[in-house]
Structures are given as C-alpha cells and as structure tokens.
C-alpha cells in the first residue's frame, strides 16, 4: 500500500480523502517531518505538535481563497507538505531549497511571511478587512501558539478584532498548558455546546436580553454578576469572551476527525471565534516529547533513533561562553540580573536560571517589556543584562531609545546571533543591529573577536555608567584559552597586525571577522602586499585615532563587518574619514558586509564566501583596491 501523502499535491487532493483516512495521513506526515529534520535540522517539536491542526484546517478551508496565517511559522511544515511542496520538502532550510518559514513568494498558499512571534492575528484581521472592503470571497484563519499569546501585539490584534466584530477565526495551539483549561466531563460538555446552533442562538438571545436590562436595580445586578461568575468557573475562555470572541474549547488538538467536525461548525458563528486546541509539542516522536526543556524546538542534525545530535562543534559555542561568563558576573556582583524574552535555552540563560533563579527573568515573548523592565531595575541600582537574539531586539527599538538610552541607564544588551544565522534565513539574520544601535545617543556598541573579548565586553558593560550592547555570532568560538575578564577602555580598539614601514592597505575588522582578515593579510604578504589589521572592538564610539591613523598611513582601507552595509560599521568609518578630510585627500575605501537585501537561508560558511567575507574574498578586495590606487597613481 502506497503512502497517502504521495497522492497529495494540493489541498484539493486532501479534500478527496475520506475523513477516516486522515489519522493515517497525519502519521505519514510526522514521519516525513522527522526524517527531514534529522538531516536538515529545524523546528521539529512545533511541527509535530500541529500536524492534525494543519490537516484539519486545509481539509475544511479552501486555500488560497481562504487565508491561513501562521504565527511564527514553526508549526507550518505540514502546511508545506500539503500545498504542492512535498517533492521539495527535503530541501527545507538548505541553500536553494524551501524556507523554514512561510514566505509569500514561495507559494500562493503562504498568505503571510512570518518568523517572529505574535503577528498572525493582526495580519489576519487586516486581510479579512481588505476582503470586506473589496468584496473578495474567502475566510481568514490565524493559527497562534500559546507562547505567542505572551506577546503584546497578539492582544492588540485580539482587542481590535473583538471591537470590529468581524468573522475572524483564531486557532490557539496550546502545547504548554500556559492557559490552564478546565478538563473533564464538564469541559467536554461545554465544548460541544459552544459549537452547537442551539448554544449560539441561546447566547445571542441572552446577550440581547441583558442589553435591555437596566443596570440600576440590585436584583438585576446580582443576575448579571451570577451569570458572569458562572461562566468564569466553567469556561477557561472568559478572557477571550471578554475581548468579544466566541470561545470554543478546549478540544483535543490531535483528534483530527473531531477537529474537522468542530471547524465545520464554526461557520455558524457571527463575529470572531477562538478555538482552543490542546496539543503536545513533539507529538509522536518520543525523544522530542520527553525533552522537557524544549520539546524538540530548533534542533540541529540528529539521530532519528535516539534524538541525540549527530555532531558537536569542536569549540564551545559563543552562546554557552556568554552564559558561563554571565553566571560568573552574577556570582561576583549580586546586583547583576539576567532577563530574556522566552529564550532561556536559546540564549543560554537556563544556566543562570538554575544557579540564580531569583535573579533570572523570562518575561515571555515580550521584548518591549523586557527592555523597559530592565530600565526600571537599573533606576534602582540593579545591573540588568538583557540577553536576546539580534533579530528580536528590533521589536523593542523605541524602548531602547526612550526608556534606556535617553535616561542613560546602565542596561547591558547581549545580542546573540549577530550576523549570518544560516538555515533560519531572512527573518532571523542578525543583519541590522549595528546600524540601528550606533545612531542612538549614549549607547556603547561592541563586538568581540573571540571568547576572551566576549568576556571582557560583558565585564566592561557591567562597569560602564550607561547603556552598552555587544553582539556575538551563532556558532562555535575560536577555542582560545580563557582569561580573567578585564574592563576595556571605552572606544579603544587594537592593532591586531602591524607591518614594518607603511602598509599598502589597512583592514579594519569588527567582531569575529577579524580572523578572516588576519588570514587574508597572511595570504597578501606572500604576494608582496603589506596589510595591517585593526580589531575595532567598538562600533560606537570608534577608536578614531587608531582607525584614521592607520588609514592615513595606508591610503587604502577595507572595512569588514557581518552586518548590513547601509548605516553599519563601514559607514561609520567612512563618516570618520570624511570628517578628517581623508576622502578628499584621495583615501580609497572598500566596505565589505551584508548587501542591501534580505539574505536568505543557507550554510553560514558558504554564504560568507559568496559575500566576500571569507579570507579569499577579503584578500581579493584588498588586491583590487591596492591595484586601483596604483593605476590612479600611474595616471
């Protein structure tokens, strides 16, 4: 017997299957996801937990006329398999292959591009309103995880949807029980009643009755309070009802037949509806289900039989080095606290949580709150460290400026995943942090070149009387022997490679690009090209004397950064050279970095080579600029 999955090239093919075949299809989808993630890595647990929801939604609704909007997109692998991408699915997260998240350009079934949390409800509501304005057919459904519900924008969307009263369907994929459901016979009874025509008519009748009841008489007030109190006791959805939603659930998110039946009944409702589905992250794969910390979230390559990683980096990852250094600082100074936004494992702060539970805060997917919470702590003498991925700090930009930098509060920002992140692609590249932080007054911006520099920069930030940020990359460190942390002079870089006499070119590197720069300089030396190398350390303030001095000696400069070129570190150097009059005097400058585009997913090493950020690319750029200057001099 062949696989049912092999017969599905579109949602129309899915709809031809009998409902009783759907459980078998779900198991086939699970196996395909497990085998693919074992080779490519990916968000295994979330996708396994949402298989039945994906199948039921596509079985009931008609994409792309009906719009299915995924929050974050971790749970959308089954969606990709059901929408014409089955044959390419094993290319997911690889160079030239499918993206790990929904992307509008990839398929007409990907209604909205996602990767960051809590956006689906707002986007879905916008699509629904656009359909109303244009008269276009189709329904809109947002699938949201319970974790995303900790983000403020999710509740902003719920609030507006309830106010407008449109026919929006929100499916809450609750896989961590963060919204505690009332289980048992009473809950099951209410779920069935909430999805019945009788209950819907009764609800409208009661609502109409209560709207005509005067508020004054004491007896009527007692009736009102009694009804509301009863609802609060018997339904976990009172919050959503209060926002204007019809609440349905909780339902079993792994009973695909029941999900189909429930979704088909939702069409009877007028106005917004929230379906609360209870699921298990990692469902159907024991190693993921038994991983209490992450349930198989964001795995790299692993052995299918055990769920264990296939290989480990030779050197310790920067994330782990940061976490250990932070724990040391927390041990030394009781004022130091750690804050993260739903990323205890991802940022390494789980180590701090285990050692200092009272001084480590996971605020949920609430980056704005995390930053202003840190600002409040700093006001009272605490030294907060906000550990966050570079791409997610973007969400709290106003708070960085208004609540921290403007008041010159000593908040430390530790930006993980600064630079290229590999398989997670466009939505997760740490491309913009240097550009968006260096323009903020009072803020110090640093980037370490190795593990010791990271330790020094954390130590420096915690001893600085003002806000400071440092960014470090995804992946393994250089494997250097660790030193005791030191306070670095603010705005002082170092000459990492000096040359006798006058250099032909000066390479100014930020962060871990230093090592490729040094390798390029060694290769250039064999060709008779003398290259000095500056480890900038600081993107703001720049070490103006060092950088401008070396530039003036060499008359040719190549800057390197693993960040966006517009407004980035190289642009800061160019501004310095312009202020010093070096550009007018004929200084040649070449800036290497990430182009003015969203860099897609792929292998980090290959992408660096393609962008000219490896040793060969840097050497080519140096030869070219030295050659141009020589030609110009000869002319």
Swiss-Prot record:
The residues the entry assigns to the signal sequence are none
UniProt EC number: 2.2.1.7
Tell me a GO cellular component: cytosol
Q: How is the cofactor bound?
A: Binds 1 Mg(2+) ion per subunit.
Q: Which residues bind thiamine diphosphate?
A: 74, 115-117, 147-148, 175, 285, 367
Instruction: List cofactor names only.
Output: Mg(2+); thiamine diphosphate
Give the function comment from the record: Catalyzes the acyloin condensation reaction between C atoms 2 and 3 of pyruvate and glyceraldehyde 3-phosphate to yield 1-deoxy-D-xylulose-5-phosphate (DXP).
Q: What is this protein called?
A: 1-deoxy-D-xylulose-5-phosphate synthase
> Which source organism?
Anaeromyxobacter sp. (strain Fw109-5)
């Amino acid at each position: 017997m062949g696989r049912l999955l092999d017969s599905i090239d579109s949602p129309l093919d899915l709809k031809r299957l009998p409902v009783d075949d759907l459980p078998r299809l779900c198991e086939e989808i699970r196996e395909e996801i497990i085998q693919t993630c074992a080779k490519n890595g990916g968000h295994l647990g979330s996708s396994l937990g949402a298989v039945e929801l994906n199948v039921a939604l596509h079985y009931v609704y008609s994409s792309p006329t009906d719009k299915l909007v995924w929050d974050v997109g971790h749970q959308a692998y089954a969606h990709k398999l059901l929408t014409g991408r089955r044959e390419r699915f094993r290319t997911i997260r690889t160079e030239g292959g499918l993206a790990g998240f929904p992307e509008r350009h990839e398929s007409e079934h990907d209604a909205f591009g996602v990767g960051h949390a809590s956006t689906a409800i707002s986007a879905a509501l916008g699509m629904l309103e656009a359909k109303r304005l244009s008269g276009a057919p189709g329904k809109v459904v947002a699938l949201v995880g319970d974790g995303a519900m900790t983000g403020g924008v999710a509740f902003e969307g719920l609030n507006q949807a309830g106010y407008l009263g449109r026919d929006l369907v929100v499916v809450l994929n609750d896989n961590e029980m963060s919204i505690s459901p009332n289980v048992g016979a009473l809950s099951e009874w209410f779920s069935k009643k909430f999805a019945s025509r009788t209950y819907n008519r009764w609800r409208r009748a009661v609502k109409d009755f209560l709207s005509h009841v005067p508020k004054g008489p004491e007896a009527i007030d007692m009736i009102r309070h009694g009804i509301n109190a009863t609802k609060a006791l018997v339904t976990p959805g009172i919050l959503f009802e209060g926002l204007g939603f019809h609440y349905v659930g909780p339902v079993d998110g792994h009973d695909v037949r029941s999900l189909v039946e429930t979704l088909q009944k939702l069409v009877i409702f007028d106005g917004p509806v929230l379906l609360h589905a209870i699921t298990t992250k990692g469902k159907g794969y024991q190693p993921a289900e038994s991983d209490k910390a992450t349930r198989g979230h964001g795995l790299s390559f692993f052995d299918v039989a055990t769920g264990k990683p296939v290989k480990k980096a030779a050197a310790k990852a920067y994330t782990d080095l940061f976490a250990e250094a932070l724990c040391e600082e927390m041990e030394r100074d009781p004022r130091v606290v750690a804050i993260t936004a739903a990323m205890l494992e991802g940022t390494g702060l789980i180590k701090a949580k285990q050692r200092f539970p009272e001084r480590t805060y996971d605020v949920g997917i609430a980056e704005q709150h995390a930053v202003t919470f840190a600002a409040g702590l700093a006001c009272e003498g605490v030294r907060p460290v906000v550990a966050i991925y570079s791409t997610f700090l973007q969400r709290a930009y106003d708070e960085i400026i208004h609540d921290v930098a403007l008041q010159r509060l000593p908040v430390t920002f530790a930006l993980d995943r600064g630079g290229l992140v590999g398989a997670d692609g466009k939505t997760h590249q740490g491309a913009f942090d240097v550009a968006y932080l260096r323009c903020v007054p009072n803020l110090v911006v640093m980037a370490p070149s190795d593990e010791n520099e990271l330790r020094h920069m954390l130590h420096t930030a915690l001893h600085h009387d003002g806000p400071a940020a440092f960014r470090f990359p995804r992946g393994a460190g250089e494997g250097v022997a660790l030193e005791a942390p030191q306070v670095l002079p603010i705005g002082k870089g170092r000459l990492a490679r000096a040359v006798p006499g006058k250099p032909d070119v000066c390479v100014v590197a930020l962060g871990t690009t230093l090592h490729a720069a040094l390798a390029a300089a060694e290769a250039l030396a064999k060709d008779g090209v003398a290259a000095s190398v500056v480890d900038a350390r600081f993107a703001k303030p720049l070490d103006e004397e060092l950088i401008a001095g070396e530039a003036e000696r060499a008359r040719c400069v190549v800057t390197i950064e693993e960040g966006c070129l517009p407004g980035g570190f190289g642009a800061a150097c160019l501004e310095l050279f312009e202020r010093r009059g070096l550009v007018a005097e004929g200084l040649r400058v070449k800036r290497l970095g990430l182009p003015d585009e969203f860099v897609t997913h792929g292998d980090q090493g290959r992408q660096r080579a393609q962008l000219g950020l490896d040793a060969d690319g840097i050497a080519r750029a140096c030869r070219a600029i030295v050659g141009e200057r020589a030609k110009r001099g000869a002319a």
